């Protein structure tokens, strides 16, 4: 964390689908939270790449991030993530679901009466 520049923090879920089954939490795990705290305390810009198979609850963190890329589970397509980070490709993806602010919003649907997600169905940014 020394020196100039920005920090690219790669966080995500521990593998769960191929082994012991479902993971019951949608929170950022404690190890990644500790990493993020160190990044925040550095005073540098922080770009977060999240590797997960579903939206995690990030509301308490995202305001501290200067950039965010939900890379999902890219597998062999991970090279595409670096293309986006280094500006070789302009991201064009859109959410095919609503990203909840908190666990109490689950299940969430864009037709819900009090619909107020963190990111709405169809949300997506590019450069």
Feature roles, as predicted:
Residues 1-127:
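C-terminal non-catalytic regions of proteins with extracellular/luminal or membrane-system context
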């Amino acid at each position: 964390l020394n020196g100039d520049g920005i920090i690219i923090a790669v966080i995500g879920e521990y593998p769960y689908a191929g082994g012991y089954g479902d993971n019951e939490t949608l929170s950022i795990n404690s190890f990644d939270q500790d990493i993020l705290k160190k990044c925040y305390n550095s005073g540098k810009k922080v770009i977060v790449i999240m590797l997960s198979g579903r939206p995690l609850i990030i509301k308490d963190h995202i305001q501290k991030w200067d950039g965010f890329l939900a890379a999902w589970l890219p597998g062999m397509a991970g090279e595409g993530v670096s293309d986006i980070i280094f500006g070789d490709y302009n991201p064009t993806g859109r959410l095919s679901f609503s990203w909840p602010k908190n666990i109490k919003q689950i299940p969430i649907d864009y037709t819900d009466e009090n619909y107020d997600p963190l990111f709405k169905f169809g949300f997506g940014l590019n450069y």
